């Protein structure tokens, strides 16, 4: 049975889950609701930052964006109806009630879902849908990198633009102020958020209460706007506006752009606390604010230029800009952390080269910082702000990547429902068809934005997809080449009977990706040094398609003959493998050695691109470049550098 406990560490509230998928998120007991409430508060600061800051710009873009429609009363009610039903169908039903059930041992996100499906199909490697699902999953993950760059830019910029409403004096300083905030945000990533993360939830709670209060203030003056909850107004909008009514969906879509991040962050808090936060606070606050903005537009159509900030009285504008900026920073922080986590998953699943991973908290293993990726994101965000120069222009670039990722998630959820849950086709197809009809409409409306900026996230997704697939394919080709040039371990051990090598004291650990063959580094050592240590450990570290591997299953130790020992260590895609941990588990299994008398032998391949079958020459050259720039195995696995011997070899791809 899945169990969860609440951990309170330095102000953090965290759900820790163990067991099988599909169980309860919170351990049953008299204080269940209290635990759920604490976790829900934490979810406000991490999970709902992106979708919670959409009121800053979403409704405005429906009327003033590149494909906006006039803010007539009928159009206002129609857009509000579309917003309400989008939040219900896409967020509430699809993600909160259905997709979040597709967890991989408590973890969510498109790569976690792909790994979940791959587990099921591992026994059927010839399954026809397997290559397609892998391609969809990797491309969906690549799309989210564009979201990770655009979200910080648009949320912070739209918040600072609230100064336009207060006074024109700040107009020349909006972009510099936004850039200062964004640069500071990325500079503090190296220090982590352990000390300030505890306030994220309460601050976002204040933000959502403010959203609700601003909306209610205007609603009491024009309660007729509540009629927009009827889907009839959405139908009327399409009937009267025709193509323009369809294109306005590109603006409506901005209210649901945080869904993929919401699903990816599920592992932090569990499904039920996230649902509790949505239905008890986030959804009511969002709808009250959108309805309040709509009521303002019914009273004054000119307010369409910035309906969110015009909801506030003049004396509240500066505090509201400050609060919106803080909320935007929190939303951006969640997206940046999500990109770090996604990249770690890609590394563990074999779709990304090794990068430097810094743990910013001694207590929470999930809080990580990737320096190289952090600076790449900063460059991308600054370039977006300087290139687009306004949140309205950025809105044109927003949407196409996320809408495509949503379609991919729906298709993969169908596979999960059919193959893992056993849902009958006649039940699954209509449900998936409903979601696809909505999401494909959003995709079509966003597709027209490609020329206006939508090309940026698509280009970025193609680049990331190319890098990820090239790395995976290159590693597979390299592994096949090394296996072909290797010899079975039994053959090597058998040859020692006639020509035994000289044995020297100590332990040698040879790291190898092939748990059955002889490590190339071992053969090179024998060839050049003509000696073997008294104890030889063949160590293979495997990444499983699970988020976490139980400690009891972490390490397998298999004694072989002539002083050889085979060790297989398994890690999940949410874990960081490390030699200190492996050695500790080996000692617990009875494998004895002295670290200062142990040498680690690693192979280091120099890759030579060729015109042989496998990959195009340009992809082989790209793979060789990625391999040269990947973090060394010594640093990545935290091997004592003064105990490492690297043996090189040239490999023609």
Curated annotation (Swiss-Prot):
<keyword id="KW-0813">Transport</keyword>
<protein>
    <recommendedName>
        <fullName>Probable potassium transport system protein Kup</fullName>
    </recommendedName>
</protein>
<dbReference type="InterPro" id="IPR003855">
    <property type="entry name" value="K+_transporter"/>
</dbReference>
<feature type="transmembrane region" description="Helical">
    <location>
        <begin position="79"/>
        <end position="99"/>
    </location>
</feature>
<keyword id="KW-0769">Symport</keyword>
<feature type="transmembrane region" description="Helical">
    <location>
        <begin position="134"/>
        <end position="154"/>
    </location>
</feature>
<dbReference type="InterPro" id="IPR053951">
    <property type="entry name" value="K_trans_N"/>
</dbReference>
<feature type="transmembrane region" description="Helical">
    <location>
        <begin position="243"/>
        <end position="263"/>
    </location>
</feature>
<keyword id="KW-0633">Potassium transport</keyword>
<feature type="transmembrane region" description="Helical">
    <location>
        <begin position="196"/>
        <end position="216"/>
    </location>
</feature>
<keyword id="KW-0472">Membrane</keyword>
<keyword id="KW-0406">Ion transport</keyword>
<dbReference type="GO" id="GO:0005886">
    <property type="term" value="C:plasma membrane"/>
</dbReference>
<keyword id="KW-1003">Cell membrane</keyword>
<feature type="transmembrane region" description="Helical">
    <location>
        <begin position="397"/>
        <end position="417"/>
    </location>
</feature>
<feature type="transmembrane region" description="Helical">
    <location>
        <begin position="278"/>
        <end position="298"/>
    </location>
</feature>
<dbReference type="Pfam" id="PF02705">
    <property type="entry name" value="K_trans"/>
</dbReference>
<feature type="transmembrane region" description="Helical">
    <location>
        <begin position="450"/>
        <end position="470"/>
    </location>
</feature>
<feature type="transmembrane region" description="Helical">
    <location>
        <begin position="37"/>
        <end position="57"/>
    </location>
</feature>
<dbReference type="GO" id="GO:0015293">
    <property type="term" value="F:symporter activity"/>
</dbReference>
<keyword id="KW-0997">Cell inner membrane</keyword>
<feature type="transmembrane region" description="Helical">
    <location>
        <begin position="320"/>
        <end position="340"/>
    </location>
</feature>
<keyword id="KW-1133">Transmembrane helix</keyword>
<comment type="similarity">
    <text>Belongs to the HAK/KUP transporter (TC 2.A.72) family.</text>
</comment>
<dbReference type="InterPro" id="IPR023051">
    <property type="entry name" value="Kup"/>
</dbReference>
<feature type="transmembrane region" description="Helical">
    <location>
        <begin position="368"/>
        <end position="388"/>
    </location>
</feature>
<dbReference type="InterPro" id="IPR053952">
    <property type="entry name" value="K_trans_C"/>
</dbReference>
<dbReference type="GO" id="GO:0015079">
    <property type="term" value="F:potassium ion transmembrane transporter activity"/>
</dbReference>
<dbReference type="Pfam" id="PF22776">
    <property type="entry name" value="K_trans_C"/>
</dbReference>
<keyword id="KW-0630">Potassium</keyword>
<comment type="function">
    <text>Transport of potassium into the cell. Likely operates as a K(+):H(+) symporter.</text>
</comment>
<keyword id="KW-0812">Transmembrane</keyword>
<feature type="transmembrane region" description="Helical">
    <location>
        <begin position="168"/>
        <end position="188"/>
    </location>
</feature>
<feature type="transmembrane region" description="Helical">
    <location>
        <begin position="426"/>
        <end position="446"/>
    </location>
</feature>
């Amino acid at each position: 049975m899945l169990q969860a406990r609440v951990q309170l560490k330095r102000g953090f509230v965290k759900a820790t889950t163990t067991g099988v998928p599909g169980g309860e998120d919170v351990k049953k007991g008299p204080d269940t609701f209290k635990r759920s409430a604490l976790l829900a508060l934490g979810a406000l600061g991490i999970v709902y930052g992106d979708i919670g800051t959409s009121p800053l710009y979403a409704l405005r873009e429906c009327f003033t964006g590149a494909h906006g429609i006039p803010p007539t009363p009928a159009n206002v009610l129609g857009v509000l109806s579309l917003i309400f039903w989008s939040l219900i169908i896409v967020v509430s039903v699809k993600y909160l009630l259905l997709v979040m059930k597709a967890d991989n041992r408590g973890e969510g996100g498109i790569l976690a879902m792909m790994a979940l499906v791959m587990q099921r199909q591992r026994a059927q490697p010839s399954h026809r849908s397997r290559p397609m699902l892998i391609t969809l999953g990797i491309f969906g993950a690549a799309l989210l990198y564009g979201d990770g760059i655009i979200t910080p830019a648009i949320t912070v910029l739209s918040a600072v633009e609230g100064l336009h409403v207060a006074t024109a004096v700040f107009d020349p300083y909006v972009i510099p102020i936004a850039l200062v905030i964004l640069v500071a945000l990325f500079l503090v990533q190296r220090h982590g958020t352990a000390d300030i993360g505890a306030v994220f939830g309460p601050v976002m709670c204040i933000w959502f209460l403010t959203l609700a209060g601003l909306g209610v203030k205007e609603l009491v003056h024009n309660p007729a706007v509540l009629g927009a909850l009827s889907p009839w107004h959405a139908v009327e909008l399409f009937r009267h506006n025709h193509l323009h009514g369809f294109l306005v969906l590109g603006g409506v879509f901005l209210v649901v752009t945080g869904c993929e991040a919401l699903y990816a962050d599920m592992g932090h808090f569990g499904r039920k606390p996230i649902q509790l936060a949505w239905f008890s606070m986030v959804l009511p606050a969002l709808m009250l604010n959108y309805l309040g903005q709509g009521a303002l537009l019914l009273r004054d159509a000119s307010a369409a230029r910035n309906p969110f900030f015009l909801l506030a009285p003049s004396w509240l504008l500066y505090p509201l800009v400050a609060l919106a900026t803080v909320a935007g920073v929190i939303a951006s922080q969640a997206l940046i952390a999500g990109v770090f986590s996604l990249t770690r998953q890609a590394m563990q699943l074999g779709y990304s080269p090794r990068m430097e991973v810094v743990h910013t908290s001694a207590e929470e293993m999930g809080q990580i910082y990737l320096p190289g990726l952090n600076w790449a994101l900063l460059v991308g965000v600054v370039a977006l702000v300087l290139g687009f120069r306004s949140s309205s222009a950025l809105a044109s670039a927003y949407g196409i990547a996320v809408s495509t990722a949503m379609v991919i998630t729906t298709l993969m959820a169908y596979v999960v429902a059919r193959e893992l849950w056993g849902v009958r086709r006649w039940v699954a197809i209509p449900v998936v068809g409903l979601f696809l009809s909505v999401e494909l409409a959003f995709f079509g409306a966003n597709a027209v934005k490609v020329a206006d900026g939508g090309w940026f996230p698509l280009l970025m997704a193609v680049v990331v997809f190319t890098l990820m697939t090239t790395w995976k394919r290159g590693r597979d080709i390299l592994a096949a080449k090394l296996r072909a040039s290797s010899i079975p371990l039994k053959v090597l051990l058998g040859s020692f009977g006639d020509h035994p090598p000289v044995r020297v004291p100590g332990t040698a650990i040879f790291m190898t990706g092939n748990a059955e063959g002889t490590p190339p580094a071992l053969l090179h050592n024998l060839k050049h040094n003509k000696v073997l240590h008294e104890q030889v450990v063949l160590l293979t570290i495997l990444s499983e398609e699970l988020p976490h591997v139980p400690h009891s299953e972490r390490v397998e130790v298999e004694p072989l003959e002539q002083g050889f020992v085979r060790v297989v260590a398994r890690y999940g895609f949410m874990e960081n493998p490390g030699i200190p941990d492996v050695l500790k588990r080996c000692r617990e299994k009875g494998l004895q050695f002295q670290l200062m008398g142990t040498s680690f032998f690693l192979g280091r391949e120099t890759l030579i691109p060729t015109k042989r079958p496998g990959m195009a020459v340009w992809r082989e050259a790209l793979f060789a470049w990625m391999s040269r720039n990947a973090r060394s195995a010594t640093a990545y696995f935290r091997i004592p550098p003064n105990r490492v011997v690297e043996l090189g070899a040239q490999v023609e791809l």
